[in-house]
From Swiss-Prot:
This is Small ribosomal subunit protein uS7. The keyword RNA-binding applies. One of its GO terms (cellular component) is small ribosomal subunit. GO terms for molecular function: rRNA binding; structural constituent of ribosome. It comes from Methanococcus maripaludis (strain C6 / ATCC BAA-1332). One of its GO terms (biological process) is translation. Coiled coil: none annotated.
Amino acid sequence: MEIKLFGKWDSETVTVKDPSLKSYVSVTPVLVPHTAGRNSKKSFDKSKMNIVERLANKLMANQNNTGKKHETLAIVEEALTIIENRTKENPVQVLVDALENSGPREETTRISYGGIAFLQSVDVSPSRRLDTAFRNIALGASQSAHKNKKTVAQCLADEIIFASKADMQKSFAVRKKEEKERVAQSAR
């Protein structure tokens, strides 16, 4: 018997195109993505956590959803169903594409030298790229659902679909990525 995510989607066929993210994007087959914090003890163990669970954890960062993992997993499952209905593709593959397109490759850091502070352009580690992508996707979904008739699941599905297409006009996460990279380019 093969294990499918939420009993619906096969994650064996999912491919990560970006070579730097291959070892950090975990699409290991799990029935319910809930590890109960087992991977939070060591620094880089979060790279072993399934990406759907990491997305659910970022959605829980909102003050209204803090600690409501079951509710958040239901939102993510509904969003993945919406993505599958709209795109007719594996929604886990669409999520991986969205993460690749919304993680910044370059950003700035503040350096002070002799009492003068200036910004210096630096490359971003793959782990930070993923963390930033998850944060921006979750933030974009919750902001677009605020004072809106659409549910959070519908807004999350929209955000993931637009980010997977790298649509800068409609995706909050891709817009933030482009903004960070533009600032980093000017700081070279």
